[in-house]
Amino acid sequence: MPPPGKVPRKENLWLQCEWGSCSFVCSTMEKFFEHVTQHLQQHLHGSGEEEEEEEEDDPLEEEFSCLWQECGFCSLDSSADLIRHVYFHCYHTKLKQWGLQALQSQADLGPCILDFQSRNVIPDIPDHFLCLWEHCENSFDNPEWFYRHVEAHSLCCEYEAVGKDNPVVLCGWKGCTCTFKDRSKLREHLRSHTQEKVVACPTCGGMFANNTKFLDHIRRQTSLDQQHFQCSHCSKRFATERLLRDHMRNHVNHYKCPLCDMTCPLPSSLRNHMRFRHSEDRPFKCDCCDYSCKNLIDLQKHLDTHSEEPAYRCDFENCTFSARSLCSIKSHYRKVHEGDSEPRYKCHVCDKCFTRGNNLTVHLRKKHQFKWPSGHPRFRYKEHEDGYMRLQLVRYESVELTQQLLRQPQEGSGLGTSLNESSLQGIILETVPGEPGRKEEEEEGKGSEGTALSASQDNPSSVIHVVNQTNAQGQQEIVYYVLSEAPGEPPPAPEPPSGGIMEKLQGIAEEPEIQMV
């Protein structure tokens, strides 16, 4: 049996045609394309005189429909769109076969449980597959031939000496300056330019950039009783230790807004923040009035206000409730029909309960003089073991980000004390697994199993806990940066999740005058 994550690529594949009721099967892509091309020729050109007469009668109403099973694609533009689409079905069939082989090689994994009827729904594809390798620009309608063509560029690429380093291969894609130690790495890199996928789920049809991501797709559907790896920060569970490590990186902030103090874990989060908080651009405009907004969701909510009749009505028998917005009808379902009137939010200071998070936010700000974290527009709440949502008391900042903050001038920040390197030393708390610069795609076969409810890693990246303290009058805010390991000392051995590190940290935070964000 191959190692975990490896796909046994076979020469002979089981490629079954799904055009209409056709049951043709072959083992090579060349024969498969030759067969499907015959379907396309017959479908596009026809063979009877009656079809030709109908075509002459209604030349403007010609449609190019795909007859592949469970596919509703129809092109009104040209037959070329249909040809590219159907050829992608052929390529997709091969990827699903590789996905099936991958599952068969993993005895511990079951099948995908998502909708089988979506297995042949493929994404929108470009007008043509264009190679942008230097001095090439060949164009293809067939994705299989396109990806093989680009792969040939990587195999024919010559090694070049760059400075004092060993010879490398250069990516010749337009606008790319990447270099690689060998051709195999260049070949993998080119997939980021072509958006090539190498495996697909045989059940739901989802396509993936590598086999590891496909197997993760299956593992994420594991039943809850088999998800043995739990995040100590948000209590989510995962089937493997690596999935937990990937998830925990989302809790560590690596990026800071250049215009305010907001920090976040992902570049996409920073882009969204910049668009919503610092940009006045409102690209989504209402056709009925002068209203404009920054995202499609807000526009859809606004359009509901133009409807004379309520757009949503309750489906429950004998209930006449109606509403203009989706938010209102969902709130009605929760409160009236799902029994969601019990308070779910609890103040961690005085134990007062609330049914909505924004009511708890008002309570924390007015009753206990809590402040929003600098640069953040709201509080975050976390579900605890008793089922109540309480204020999230810990925020993780990477060491690199905190050092960047320390280098910035502290004038006008409102801090009661100045921050320097000496104030950060000597306090050992804990390490959080995960490297901020880790590649998004891992090598195949690196998925691993573990036996504990916490993640571990040979080289965990240092993390800083940011603790905001506010006095009883709410006059001053002091920020303490706590290093995860003391300078000059080896990192402490990781403790099990029940070892009390997080409990001690939160115990300190739950004092009335402490706010941990």
UniProtKB/Swiss-Prot annotation:
The keyword DNA-binding applies. Residues 374-407 are annotated as: Required for activation of histone H4 transcription and contributes to DNA-binding. InterPro entries: Znf_C2H2_sf, Znf_C2H2_type, ZnF_E-box_Homeobox. The keyword Cell cycle does not apply. One of its GO terms (molecular function) is DNA binding. Coiled coil: none annotated. Gene3D superfamilies: Classic Zinc Finger. Keywords: Activator, DNA-binding, Metal-binding, Nucleus, Repeat, Repressor, Transcription, Transcription regulation, Ubl conjugation, Zinc, Zinc-finger. One of its GO terms (biological process) is regulation of DNA-templated transcription. Its main location: nucleus. It is found in: Nucleus. Transcriptional repressor that binds to the consensus sequence 5'-CGGACGTT-3' and to the RB1 promoter. Transcriptional activator that promotes histone H4 gene transcription at the G1/S phase transition in conjunction with NPAT. Also activates transcription of the ATM and PRKDC genes. Autoregulates its expression by associating with its own promoter. This is Histone H4 transcription factor. It comes from Homo sapiens (Human).
